[in-house]
Amino acid sequence: MAKLAICILVFALFALALSARVPREESNPAQEFLTKAQGDFNEFIEKLKALDAKKVEGLFKDGLNTVQEGLQKLNETFLQAPAAST
C-alpha cells in the first residue's frame, strides 16, 4: 500500500513539474516586418484615395518644373565649362 502511495505521489509531482513549464512566445522578426509593411501599404493606399485630378496635375507640373530647372542648370554648367582640347 505504501509503495502505491509513493508511486502516485511521484507521478503527481512529475505531472506538476511538467505542467509548470510555461512556453515563452518569442518575437518573430519576419512577422514584425510584415505587420509594419502592411501598415505602410495601407497608409499609402489611403493617401492615394485622397488624391484627385487637380492634385495629380499639380504634382505633375511641379515635378516637370523641377526637372526643367535641373536640366537648365546642367546645360548652363556645360556651356560654362571650357572645352578640352584634343
UniProtKB/Swiss-Prot annotation:
**Record bears the keyword Translocase:** no
Its GO biological process annotations read:
humoral immune response; neuropeptide signaling pathway
Q: Which conditions up-regulate this protein?
A: By bacterial infection (at protein level).
| Endpoints of the signal sequence | 1-19
Which UniProt keywords are present, listed alphabetically? Answer: Neuropeptide, Secreted, Signal
GO terms under cellular component: extracellular region; extracellular space
One molecular function GO term is: neuropeptide hormone activity
Give expression by tissue.
Hemolymph (at protein level).
Protein's cellular compartments? Secreted
Q: Which superkingdom?
A: Eukaryota
Give the propeptide segment as residue ranges.
20-34, 45-86
Protein's UniProt name:
Neuropeptide-like 2
Q: What is the lineage of its organism?
A: Eukaryota, Metazoa, Ecdysozoa, Arthropoda, Hexapoda
